[in-house]
Amino acid sequence: MNCLFLVSDEGYGHTVRQSCIANELAKRGAKITFQCRDPIPLATKILNKNIKIYNQFNLVRLVKQDGGVDVERTYNFFKNYITISKDWIKYMLNSPHVLNADIIVTDIVEEAGILSNELNKPTVAISHFTWHWLLRELDQMFEEIAQYLETCLSGISEFLYPPFSKRINQFPNPKPINLIARIPRKREYIREELKINDDEILIILAGGGTPVWRGIFNSIDINKNNQFVFLTDSSTISNNIKRVPKPFKLHDYINASDLVISRGGYGTISETLAYGVRHLILVEENHPEAIENANILRKVDHAMVRNLNNFLNEPYDLIEESLNIKMNLAPMRSDGHIQAADHIFKILDSFSSE
């Protein structure tokens, strides 16, 4: 089986989930081409060495400001989106690595539905949201583009969604799967590598390198509580915060931590839920996907949710509260990549027999 992966975002969660599925398929003998933009690089570190990475940007881009989405600048970027999208589709329809694929898997590049129809190939999407939903949440001025993307998505053969996905009724032919998270190394090994004592509390700051989060780094006084050790997955100008030695092994550090403080990205959420780690989500404005993630988790006691600006004013009070508040820490099943691989083989077999 030749399988083409189209990953629409260079962020942590998208790449990790799709890489887990690609590695599982490769383990079963599939030939994989993984198309993504990978400046971190992350995919190159976690993908099976036999998987070919095709380094190309896959369309959707949100312009960020202070952690949230800059709606006006994003809209300016999207003014010619439909034309750019159709040019991308035309290019893909004539690309050998696309023509040679037996099946397409995406996280969700909604235009993959057009490729599926035009090339008569099955396409599977695995995601917890869609871009057309997110654009509509941002502002009604994105409606034309949202309608276009929704039409593209209708060509998807099957849509696999993990727990706490949003607006499931918008997915074509939806099927539930479990969380997708990498298997971490043992907690005690990582804490020993990081030189964390048994009586110390390891806190991961996983929010990205935006100006707001750099302000958070600077708001922390390491001398206020010598029991706390702070790590981050981002560059930091604060001497109070240590940088994780290997960002592509963030799952190991999350598993070894006592508390994760994040902006509510689904990749970080998946790992805290899979490993049973306490989670403090700091909500930012103009970030619909993360805000919805936070609201869903708060309702089921899987995370504490507070306003990001509150943390700037009283970081240690919120840290103490999140370390002591009642929270559902039972680890959730995280074999969704195995379930996804099963679905992909089943869909291809069914398609081939028609």
Predicted segments with their positions:
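A short, glycine/small-residue-rich beta-strand->loop->alpha-helix junction that serves as a flexible
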Residues: 7-19, 213
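Conserved nucleotide-sugar phosphate-binding/catalytic loop shared by glycosyltransferases and other
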Residues: 9, 27-28, 32-83
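Conserved nucleotide-sugar donor-interacting segment of glycosyltransferase catalytic cores
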Residues: 93-150
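C-terminal amphipathic helix plus adjacent low-complexity
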Residues: 317-354
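Donor-nucleotide binding loops and adjacent catalytic segments primarily
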Residues: 22, 182-259
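A donor-sugar binding/catalytic signature common to diverse glycosyltransferases
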Residues: 104-108, 125, 249-292
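Conserved nucleotide-sugar donor-binding subdomain of glycosyltransferases
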Residues: 69-103, 110-111
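A nucleotide-sugar donor-handling region in carbohydrate enzymes
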Residues: 134-211
